[in-house]
Amino acid sequence: MNNILNFYPAVITTDVAENWQIGFQDPATPIMEGIINLHYDLMFFICVISVFVSWMLGRTLWHFEQNQNKIPSSLTHGTLIEMIWTVTPAFILLIIAVPSFSLLYAMDEIISPAITIKTLGHQWYWSYEYSDYLNEDDDSINYDSYMIPEEDLEIGQFRLLEVDNRMVIPINTHIRVIVTAADVLHSWAVPSFRSKCDAIPGRLNQTSLFIKREGVYYGQCSEICGINHGFMPIVVEATSLPNYVSWISNKLNE
């Protein structure tokens, strides 16, 4: 039960970076969906502005080329045009700012979490603690997550991304992840969640998750933390609530 979704086809359950990928991974949280939608909205403005500026530059170079225009223009001031190129960009920035501010607010909002998971970064592995659950000895669920060496990988597993113990969470549940570090700076990052939370020794940072679909999601430490920085991947397994409860029960009985 440690890796609940191993029997599903990898193409369905894995959200992982691909070779030569330049776009986003498939979103698994409402926040990531909002970020992607905002990106597409901004790209519209970027394309329109880029085409307009390129046209203006080309038109200027063509009409004011030395061989065609021996006498340079003496225009030094134009109130109307100056108002236009001041007010128009300000209006565009305002249109862009409103949805981005609401998204930034939502990214920092922690909504009545049902589960709290503590994440601790080490050189060079992650530790997870589920302090909401205690066994008969009042011990919480606590385990380390190391990268699987390349020679131990099974067919279909991803090089430099697989771990021996995944972080397991339920879908459609508000989750709080508390992140810190034991030695140097780390960063807990999973692209499909839009999550990137710095792990700082002596400080607790937090982020929230609300996963909408089952799957296995891959991330990596995103803060240079030493010689093996590239060898501390993150794997999050999102499963149904009954499977999650079963996994918790097995962990408590170990």
UniProtKB/Swiss-Prot annotation:
Mg(2+) binds at residue 223. It is found in: Mitochondrion inner membrane. The keyword Electron transport applies. Cu cation A2 binds at residues 221, 223, 225, 229. Residues 59-83 are mitochondrial matrix. It is an enzyme of class 7 (translocase). PROSITE patterns: COX2, COX2_CUA, COX2_TM. It catalyses: 4 Fe(II)-[cytochrome c] + O2 + 8 H(+)(in) = 4 Fe(III)-[cytochrome c] + 2 H2O + 4 H(+)(out). GO terms for biological process: ATP synthesis coupled electron transport. One of its GO terms (cellular component) is mitochondrial inner membrane. Keywords: Copper, Electron transport, Magnesium, Membrane, Metal-binding, Mitochondrion, Mitochondrion inner membrane, Respiratory chain, Translocase, Transmembrane, Transmembrane helix, Transport. Cu cation A1 binds at residues 186, 221, 225, 232. InterPro entries: CcO_II, CcO_II-like_C, CcO_II_C, Copper_CuA, Cupredoxin, Cyt_c_oxidase_su2, Cyt_c_oxidase_su2_TM_dom, Cyt_c_oxidase_su2_TM_sf. SUPFAM superfamilies: Cupredoxins, Cytochrome c oxidase subunit II-like, transmembrane region. Residues 1-37, 105-254 are mitochondrial intermembrane. Component of the cytochrome c oxidase (complex IV, CIV), a multisubunit enzyme composed of a catalytic core of 3 subunits and several supernumerary subunits. The complex exists as a monomer or a dimer and forms supercomplexes (SCs) in the inner mitochondrial membrane with ubiquinol-cytochrome c oxidoreductase (cytochrome b-c1 complex, complex III, CIII). Belongs to the cytochrome c oxidase subunit 2 family. Component of the cytochrome c oxidase, the last enzyme in the mitochondrial electron transport chain which drives oxidative phosphorylation. The respiratory chain contains 3 multisubunit complexes succinate dehydrogenase (complex II, CII), ubiquinol-cytochrome c oxidoreductase (cytochrome b-c1 complex, complex III, CIII) and cytochrome c oxidase (complex IV, CIV), that cooperate to transfer electrons derived from NADH and succinate to molecular oxygen, creating an electrochemical gradient over the inner membrane that drives transmembrane transport and the ATP synthase. This is Cytochrome c oxidase subunit 2.
